[in-house]
Amino acid sequence: MSASPVVGTREIAYRVFAAEFDDASLSYSESDEERAPNYVVTPTGARLNRTFVAGVLTEVEHVNDEVLRGRIADPTGAFVTYAGQYQPEPMAFLEGATAPAFVSLAGKARTYEPDDADVVYSSVRPESVNTVDADVRDRWIVSAAEATLRRIAVFDEALSMPYRGDDLTRALEARGVDPTLAAGVPRAIDHYGTTRTYLDALREVAIQALELVAGDRDQVDPLDVAPGDGGDGGDAVLGPLPELDLEPAESVDIEVGEADADEGDELGEPEADAGEAEAEPDDFEAESDEETADEPEPELLDSAESEADSEPESEPVAETESEPEPEPEPEPVA
């Protein structure tokens, strides 16, 4: 599938809400090479190697003597991040931080599945953590909501198209969808069976987040629908979504591969805007300038992993949270 856009030598840090990131259970690498980038694909098709978050640091705790776990809440839930010896600056920041505090986090998206549990945890391996203010947090909420609504619109469009798999990727790209999203949507359809019922529930979460920033509500309702809920979603009607500037579906004429098109599935035309894929703004200062390939995951996380599995973790501030485990990986972790 298409290569991801990069900024210099680094992949773009995309923005997703914690509620959707918490639902992510698909990760993959496009090659077997040791340092090949790893991607987490969310239920709306966001394909994340790196992600950028701004929210409230609600808790910092020791997983063991060498690993810290932090929780950063947005209006929809909480992101979990683990810092150890291979992340000295984020670890030092978390050690000295006093919760609650507004912070930004840039890092690698990861998933982890314990051997003895039928559950997948998502987390962010930190590249940088910085102090920000409420205005930065609010701007992040707006940008994450706008990116989420665009992805939902593209996904809805994709569900109405007669293609699946690589054929759908090519068809979406031919219509003008960003290559990264065009590669993620078919994988999300195949892995999650994401329905329009879920899309509309997530759409409502994004709208409520915008209303929260505008001062029209006090909190965002929890996302209590799973990606595959609602059957095939054929009867679900989505509320208002952004207009997509895409080529007409009838203008797309691609050669269908062996994996051919599924006729009965509804795919909608979602669009991946550059806005969604933009690198973090300067005032967020959330990344180190010369990050290239993924570093090996700290071995000390092996011990942290068993602890993280068994932790019930309560989130002090926001809602649902993705309870990620530190992963021992040969490459970057989630």
What is each stretch, according to the model?
Residues 1-40, 205-213, 223-232, 238-240:
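OB/S1-fold single-stranded nucleic-acid-binding modules
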Residues 41-51:
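Short, glycine/small-residue-enriched coil/turn segments at secondary-structure junctions
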Residues 49-59, 98-111, 124-129:
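OB-fold and OB-like beta-barrel modules that bind single-stranded nucleic acids
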Residues 60-65, 114, 134:
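Short, conserved beta-turn/loop elements at beta-strand boundaries and strand-helix junctions
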Residues 95-102, 115-218, 322:
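Extended, charge-rich, solvent-exposed interface segments
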Residues 221-334:
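Long, low-complexity intrinsically disordered regions
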Residues 88-93:
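Short alpha-helix capping/helix-loop boundary micro-motifs
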Residues 46, 62-87:
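OB-fold (S1/OB) nucleic-acid-binding surfaces
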